Amino acid sequence: SQEDILLGELARLQTMLAKYEHDENYEKAAIVANKIKWLENKISKL
């Protein structure tokens, strides 16, 4: 379903966020964090 796809993408982005923060790549981390917020909002509206 669409929700499963979005949840999979959310998990992928959260993994990327953790990696970027660990590597102290904060610009990319901020971009990914914004995508996560957008995706969480979209999932909550399903």
What role is predicted for each listed range?
Residues L13, E24-N25:
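Flexible coil/linker segments and helix-coil junctions enriched in charged and small residues
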